[in-house]
Amino acid sequence: MRKNATMIISSAENASTLATTNLAANLADVRNRIAKARSSNELQLPALVAVSKRQPHDRIEAALAAGQRIFGENRVQEAQVRWASRRGLYPELELRLIGPLQTNKVVDAVELFDVIEVVDRPKLASSLSSEMARQGRHLPCYVQVNTGEEHQKSGIWPEKADEFIAFCRDKCSLDIVGLMCIP
C-alpha cells in the first residue's frame, strides 16, 4: 500500500442536494482536481476518500460504478453491514475507519478496515497492536490530533503528538503513516 496524502473535498450545502445521477460527473471533477494537485506535489499523492456514512445504498453503488474504491466509515457496526457483501465484489476496495474507535470494537475494526485513522490514546494503540498481531495484519494508522485543543473532541493535543507517535511506533509497533487532524 502506498502512502498517500488524504484530500477531503467537501461542501456541506452541496452534499445534501447532490443527485446520484451526478455522482460520476462530480467524482470526475474531483479526480481532475487531484490530478492537478499531483502534478504540483511529487512527494505525496492525494487520495480521494469518499465518506460513506449515512449514505443510501444507491449512492454507494453509484460511487462504486464510477470507480471510487476508497471509502471512509465512521462506525464499525454500520461499516460491517454496508461492506461485508461488497468486499468480494470489489477486491481493490480500501476501507478507512475515520470515526471514534472504542477498544471493545478493535477486533472487528482490524478485521474489516484497511486503514485506521483514529489512533488517539495509548490503550487504543496497545489494543490495536495486540489485535493486529493476533490476526496477522499490519494496518497503516494515523494519529488523531485535536489541533483545536477542544475538550469535547477526541485526539491527542498537539504538544503531546510527538511523544504519542513515538509510543505508537516504539512500544506498539504501529505503522504510523500520518496525522488525522481535528480543528
Model-assigned labels for residue ranges:
Residues 2-183:
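Conserved alpha/beta-domain cores
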